[in-house]
């Protein structure tokens, strides 16, 4: 199956936006929930699940379910290894050289208190420091993907979706918070803010739509609902920017739009916007050459994804020695964004150069012949 250029571009854009979101740059105004009450995290999880569902279905049809299951687990293992290498570098950098800086102490507080316990917790994905908490969620969901497809084979996708929605519903009463309270003070457990009981609904939905896409089935709802979804997307967009321009919005701060537990209105906003985006993505092929660097960033997302996390960890310290407060604030706001964006874009440019390299000798030979 041919790679989906549109999704590669989308993942590249999401990665660059995520770099800015994890910085203190003023550009966050335009990258942090710019299209409504959802962030790049929801998009990243959903798009990744969509591709996982598509690829699992393709492998299962061509090589059998066992081969698809093995490939899915193998990929999850590779991503887990990349995450652990990234985390290990952050531990070494922060623990050996930068532990006296407040920013590093905030990021790696549990690790600095009990290093061996934190390392053990990281291996089993129970220790997830800030800025490095979304990949463990992705890894866990990837390991569970074969189980979701096995359940769908046995009982059908309706049952799987209903079960997933039920878990999400239970998550709205903050069951996870009770578990965190029970393990409070345990040095090797730092689960991060994401409620996996809620976020699994995005993953299961992405798997479901990915396998439908592979089978050529319709992904969009009934045509009669299309105007309603568009109107819903515009309404949330206006609401979001109104809350930014005119100040605090009390409703936006309630559980209905909660990010970590995926409040119901937040889900409605995301899926409505996803419908609109799906209708627009097909037009990206018209600018394939122009958007090629972004598509290559998205195609090589795993190695690129790990680099901004390392840079954000390191950029908490360089400007904190011997500078006045104004210069200090300027450095802290620009370093993460500049470093992260640079190390995200460079692989795309390098890959683009490699893509055009095979044509160079041919052009040169023709010139010599003339």
Model-derived regions, located:
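Alpha-helical transmembrane segments and their immediate juxtamembrane cytosolic regions
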Residues: 1-370
């Amino acid at each position: 199956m041919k790679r989906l250029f549109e999704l590669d571009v989308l993942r590249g854009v999401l990665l660059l936006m995520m770099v800015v979101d994890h910085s203190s740059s003023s550009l966050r105004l335009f990258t942090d929930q710019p299209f409504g009450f959802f962030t790049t995290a929801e998009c990243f999880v959903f798009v990744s699940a969509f591709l996982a569902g598509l690829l699992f279905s393709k492998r299962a049809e061509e090589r059998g379910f066992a081969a698809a299951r093995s490939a899915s687990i193998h990929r999850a293992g590779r991503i887990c290894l990349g995450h652990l290498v990234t985390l290990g570098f952050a531990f070494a950098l922060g623990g050996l050289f930068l532990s006296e800086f407040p920013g590093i102490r905030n990021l790696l507080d549990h690790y600095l208190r009990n290093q061996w316990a934190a390392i053990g917790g990281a291996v089993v994905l129970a220790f997830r420091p800030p800025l490095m908490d979304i990949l463990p969620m992705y890894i866990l969901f990837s390991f569970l993907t074969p189980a979701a497809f096995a359940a769908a084979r046995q009982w059908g996708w309706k049952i799987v979706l209903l079960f997933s929605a039920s878990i999400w519903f239970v998550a709205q009463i903050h069951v996870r918070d009770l578990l965190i309270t029970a393990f409070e003070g345990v040095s090797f457990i730092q689960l991060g803010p994401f409620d996996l009981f809620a976020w699994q609904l995005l993953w299961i939905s992405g798997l479901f739509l990915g396998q439908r896409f592979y089978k050529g089935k319709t992904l969009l709802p009934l045509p009669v609902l299309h105007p309603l979804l568009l109107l819903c997307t515009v309404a949330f967009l206006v609401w979001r920017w109104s809350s930014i321009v005119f100040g605090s919005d009390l409703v936006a701060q309630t559980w209905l739009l909660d990010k970590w537990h995926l409040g119901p209105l937040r889900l409605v906003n995301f899926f409505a916007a996803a419908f609109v985006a799906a209708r627009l993505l097909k037009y990206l092929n018209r600018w394939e050459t122009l958007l090629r660097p972004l598509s290559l960033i998205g195609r090589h997302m795993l190695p690129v994804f790990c680099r901004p996390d390392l840079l954000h960890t390191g950029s908490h310290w360089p400007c904190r020695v011997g500078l006045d407060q104004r210069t200090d604030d300027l450095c802290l706001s620009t370093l993460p964004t500049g470093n992260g964006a640079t190390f995200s874009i460079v692989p795309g440019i390098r890959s683009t150069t490699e893509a055009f390299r095979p044509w160079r000798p041919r052009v040169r030979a023709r010139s010599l012949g003339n």
